[in-house]
Each structure stands twice: as C-alpha cells, then as structure tokens.
Amino acid sequence: MTRMSTGIQVVDDLLGGGIRTGALNLVYGAPGVGKTSLCMSIALGLCDEEGSVVVLDTENGWSETRLAGVCEAVGKPGRDKSVKVYRSGTMAEQHRIASKIIEEDIESNDWAPRAIVMDSAVAHYHASLLGTPAGFLASKARELQGRLSVQVNSLVRLASSYNSVLMATSWLKSGVGEKMSEKKIIEVALQAKQEKPVGDVEGAFGAVGYGLIGGQHIAYMAKSIIRMSATKLRHDVKALVLEKCVDAATARVVFVQLDQRGVTSYGEPKVLPMSEAIAVVLGELK
C-alpha cells in the first residue's frame, strides 16, 4: 500500500500525507452532507490522462452533467469521459457488479483504475432491512452484512491489484439506534450491579462506536474513516472528522466547502484538534 494525493491539500494533511491505495477508505455522514462531492473531487484529483475511475453508484448521484461541470470547474475538461459509472437498483445487482462485473470489465477493457468508488455501500442494505418484519431483522442484517463484506473484500482485492484508491460511503445511524445503545448501557450496568456476568464490556464502559450503517465489519476493514458533518459556519461549509486512520492521529478536524469545483479547503487550510475545531465554530457564531 502506498499513499496518493487527493488533490485537496487539507485532506492530504488530515490523512497524514495522502490517501491509502489498496485499502478501504470510508466516508459517512447524514444525507446531503456532501459525501458524493468529496468522493468525486478526490477521484478526479487522482485520475490522470492515462487512468480511469470506476464508480458503483447506488443512489444516482454521479450524473454526467454533474461530473462534466466539476471537471470543467477544476480545469480538467473532458476528464469525465474517464469515469466509468455502474448503477444498481437492488442489493443483488450491487453484489454482482462489485464482486464480478467490475473486475471483468477492467481486465477486458484494459483500464488502469486510479480510483474505485462505492457510493453508497449501504443504500440497498438499508432498504432491505426496512422491508423486513421485526422478528427477522437480526438474521436479515447478518445475511446482508455478509454479502456486503464479500463485496468490500472483492473491491479491496481489486484495488490492491491495481494500486488503486478504494472509497466507499455509508450513512449516519438514526437517533433510534442511539436510544437503543443508551438502553443497552443501562441494562449492562444493572447486570454489573447484580454481579451477573457482563459479556458486553464496551457497553459496560459506555464506549462509543462508529455511528455508521452497514455493520462493524466495514469499520474493521477500513484503514481510514472520515465522518462528514454540516456546520453552522455556513451552509456550504462542512467538517471532516478523522475517526480512524493508520497513518495519522484521530479526533482531528478540517473544514472544507462545497462549490462548483466539488470540495475545496475553507479558510486557513489547517488540521485542528476536535476541541479547537468546535471553538472555531462557536467563535464564528458569537
């Protein structure tokens, strides 16, 4: 694995000197926060004249018009022609494309993928769970997480073979999930008071996990996890919070803005500890 520049200096700095190739780099956040724009900007930043970008688009966010507009704005007109977009309407289609078709097409067309993007990894996963009766949710979730793991493993192997950057997006867990976690902590604490065996040690200590949808296996596999959040600085200014990284300290933040160029640095391009980043927002609000 090597590291490559994302084309956004402040993001390179956040990740400790660039984004890892041959490994899963995960971005998650609330709907509409800019995850697709971030992936698009990084992918186009990685793509040179000889390379290509392969995208598995499950949410119809990678439109030809949008791609062409970003390429024009960043001074790379026509580079959108190097982006190969696959679209899936079901989990079964997503599985087939991720685990088989992309690899076959790369080999048969002699593409040189600089980036592989799965945006998002969890749209069909979430939709499938919503349609499952409550009594079968646990078993259905395990089944879907298993399929998702196979897909991610296939793409990691592919990215490793071509020394490509692999990015995937996920969604933020709902408030219902947070309430369930709070209830679990209370139950575990009660078990401890009654001197019963405590199996969930993390729950007993109130440990905070990753707030993303898709199961813990995705979090385990990822070499970097960025949570993207809206801020009160401006509607187009977002915070990128580094929650996991093998190359850099976590709980650090950079601010970026969304415009016609996709994602660019906001203000002074500087990596901040979480406490300082929060202070910046509070200072702007006064």
Predicted region positions:
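Hydrophobic/aromatic beta-strand patches that form the interior of the parallel beta-sheet core
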Residues: 25-27, 54-56, 84-86, 167, ...
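Aromatic-anchored, glycine/proline-accented short structural segments
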Residues: 115-120, 124-137, 141-169, 176
